[in-house]
Amino acid sequence: MQPVFSRFPYASKSGFISLASRGYAVSRNSGSSIKSNLRSKPRADTRWNTKAKPPVKNRKSNGKGDHRSHSRSDSRAKPSQEQTQQQFQYGEYGKLSEGDPKILERSKRLVSKINDFSQLKILPEVRDKLMEVISSESLLNKNLLDVKYNPKENNVQEFKKHLKPSPIQTTAIYQTSKTLMDPQLQVRLIAAETGSGKTMAYLIPLVDYLKRTEMENPSWETLKDKAIVRSIILLPTHELVEQVYQTVSKLEPALGMHTYKWDAGSSYKGFVEALKGRIDIMVTTPGKILSLFNISMVNRPDRILSQVKFLVMDEADTLLDKSWVEDSYSTIKHMQNLNHVLFCSATIPKEFQKTITRLFPTVGVIASPNLHKINHKNQIKLINADMAPYKGSKTKALAQILYSINRDNIDPGFEKRVVIFVNEKENVPLVATKLANQYGHDVVALTGNDSVEERLEKIKPFMDPPKKMTTRKSEKVTTENTVTMKIPNSNIVIEEIPEDNEAFVESTLKVLVTTDVLARGINFRGCRYVVLYDIPNTPVDLVHRVGRTGRMNQKGSVFIITGKRVKNWVKAIPSIVSKNVSIS
């Protein structure tokens, strides 16, 4: 019997893998590299109605921080009155893509009709286990105000009764389940705001697909003992690889999933050993996949990758950015028999939208109704460092913010976490040193110059649940000697640091100073506070930085340090967020 995928030819006589026959847009020149395509003039491919190369221009890096550069469109098209009311134009920088009204409306209808996991087409064993995982990882969900998961009390069943799918989980699971087991290639883009539960939005369909394949594939009894990789989740950083793997690995005991994390600390020997026992879900980076072709220990890596049926590319706007697209695209080309490709992103920059639609013309978009919106429950507070009493000292303004956070009586008895973002990585140690030496804070400084092991060690305390404090703060500062002050040219009233700041030194704060290297995807559990020491350069950076707090509809506080020359769009951010308007 002819294999199902034989009608999707890949290899030509010259050995070049042709993806055009499966909906991918690629060069027809056998042996030509994607790099040459990047530099060449695009040729129209009339058969596939797309360009024959990834649409990425050679742009100079902005050189700021550790983050990848993003596109900055100069489009000045005048928006309609309705668009003006629904979209916030972010200064002079390139706009994020506006969501398709039809797609957003369809998502709203689905969310209004489906409010329980039992209404979604998921295998019962998969649904129950993944709901348990969600419960164990949820700190506070808007539907769980009165019930908190406590593993020691084993109240997961009670917790699950109150657990509801997030809007993007509802939409993504519903849309993918309709054709989950259809044999043709299916390419989808899952787009939703930060902290909306996107990991589970792609993980549930992935696991459901694997378990259904085991049930429906007659040859599974033979395949299950083969050295194969069945699915891969790709991420841009090893911090995200670690985070996603911690979730995926919880599926092993109950569902019999063989999971594997292939990061910077993994050896090729370890990969080979894991492969012998079958890998159901591998979490890694594009670079690690491509490295398979450079070692002799792994025989015919193309055969291994040809067994992959389900691919997830998380933080897709980064992985298809100019700096990553060559590796990411090459990685996908080696997976010849894919059934599902899921791209996942919290932001859809216009350049990314052009790239993905040209590389994958058949891509279907699944978007949250709240795409490109900052959680309206977040409090956005502007602090003008040029005004008295700071007189141009951003460090003093930052110290006052941290003092205010320490005294705000939110989550009493628990350690508080604050993440501070700066634009330049050179400023990270400077800011951290001042906070530690002058104000006695427990500060961690992290940049891309740190090794993977160092970064993972530094962020671990911020990813674990908040610690309960066993000692009380000093009582030296009392209501009688505390001074309340209004910050000039801001919308916040805080307490002034007293001259005797011994109580201030005994802080329960844990502070992380970093750049945009940690602005994407990282789930800082229990982090209610984000400080933007510098104004973000792009709307993408703004959305991702602010998205480190207020996750899963929790409340968070964001402090933005500004100056006299602050632009009007910065002043408008608090109003835009409170009105729940999309940022474009």
Swiss-Prot record:
Q: Which InterPro entries match?
A: DEAD/DEAH_box_helicase_dom (IPR011545), Helicase_ATP-bd (IPR014001), Helicase_C-like (IPR001650), P-loop_NTPase (IPR027417)
Q: Which residues form the Helicase C-terminal domain?
A: 397-584
By its UniProt entry, which SUPFAM superfamilies does this protein fall under? P-loop containing nucleoside triphosphate hydrolases
Give me the residues that bind ATP, please: 192-199
Q: Extract the ranges annotated as region (Disordered).
A: 28-92
Return the broad EC class: hydrolase
Q: Where is the composition biased (Polar residues)?
A: 28-39
Q: What is known of its domains?
A: The Q motif is unique to and characteristic of the DEAD box family of RNA helicases and controls ATP binding and hydrolysis.
Q: What does this protein do?
A: ATP-binding RNA helicase involved in mitochondrial RNA metabolism. Required for maintenance of mitochondrial DNA.
Q: What is this protein called?
A: ATP-dependent RNA helicase MRH4, mitochondrial
- Protein source organism: Kluyveromyces lactis (strain ATCC 8585 / CBS 2359 / DSM 70799 / NBRC 1267 / NRRL Y-1140 / WM37)
